[in-house]
């Protein structure tokens, strides 16, 4: 069974993404700094920051659906450049780790 990592698993759209993955027989792992919006016993959830993942964590992951972003609106308004930079760095860092771990798709 292919394994998919869904980042930002407490986000608004993620329940639909996870449900679609499960219907298509994917093993699903969600990661977010917050508790998941939906709790499905068929999914494994990790409560952590995506930036803390390493290559070893991704070694058995076939696909990554990256939906994690800093969405704190007051912080984003006060620090738009830092927030944008942090989001870009998070994505680039995850892409780099995924490539080194030989993930099939990002």
What are the residue ranges of the model-derived segments?
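N-terminal Rossmann-like NAD(P)+-binding domain of SDR-like oxidoreductases, especially those catalyzing
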Residues: 1-106
């Amino acid at each position: 069974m292919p394994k998919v990592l869904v980042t930002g698993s407490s986000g608004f759209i993620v329940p639909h993404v996870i449900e679609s993955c499960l219907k298509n027989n994917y093993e699903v792992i969600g990661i977010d700094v917050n508790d998941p919006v939906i709790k499905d016993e068929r999914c494994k959830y990790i409560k952590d920051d995506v930036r803390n993942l390493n290559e070893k964590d991704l070694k058995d992951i076939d696909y990554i659906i990256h939906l994690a972003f800093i969405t704190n609106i007051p912080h984003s308004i006060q620090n738009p450049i830092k927030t944008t930079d942090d989001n870009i760095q998070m994505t680039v860092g995850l892409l780099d780790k995924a490539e080194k771990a030989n993930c099939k798709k990002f």
